[in-house]
Amino acid sequence: MGSDFYLRYYVGHKGKFGHEFLEFEFRPDGKLRYANNSNYKNDVMIRKEAYVHKSVMEELKRIIDDSEVTKEDDALWPPPDRVGRQELEIVIGDEHISFTTSKIGSLIDVNQSKDPEGLRVFYYLVQDLKCLVFSLIGLHFKIKPI
């Protein structure tokens, strides 16, 4: 699968229920690591690990390439605050990018930022990545073998 690809995403905050977060990463060898921590109603941390096929890794690269997020800069994005923070780190080929911003509640937050075009690219990419990861985790851990 090559060592030219890595992705990590984190979103979280520290509040009345402690440190609540969602984090996932795809490693160069195809390992998907997922963690979801919510202390709401004494919930426990969910940790899952699975290996994904190289075709999934290729699709992930395609999604990132199509988004053109590697052309963006987070300098004008809202900084992390008491509401929370998001981090996205991607290594793809020779490029290594890292973004940090506050939690984004909706497109209204995006449109009111100092860089709505760039933040919109980030926002939609994160939505796509979360959807893919939730689907992979759900399918991998809920399917019953025959």
Curated annotation (Swiss-Prot):
Gene Ontology CC annotation, any one: catalytic step 2 spliceosome
Name of a matching Pfam family: Mago_nashi
Alphabetical list of InterPro entries matching this protein: Mago_nashi, Mago_nashi_sf
UniProt record, GO biological process: mRNA processing; mRNA transport; RNA splicing
Keywords from the named record: Cytoplasm, mRNA processing, mRNA splicing, mRNA transport, Nucleus, RNA-binding, Transport
GO terms for MF: RNA binding
CDD domains the record matches: Mago_nashi (cd11295)
Family: Belongs to the mago nashi family.
Function: Core component of the splicing-dependent multiprotein exon junction complex (EJC) deposited at splice junctions on mRNAs. The EJC is a dynamic structure consisting of core proteins and several peripheral nuclear and cytoplasmic associated factors that join the complex only transiently either during EJC assembly or during subsequent mRNA metabolism.
Subunit structure comment from the entry: Part of the EJC core complex that contains casc3, eif4a3, magoh and rbm8a.
Stated name of the protein: Protein mago nashi homolog
Organism: Xenopus laevis
Gene: magoh
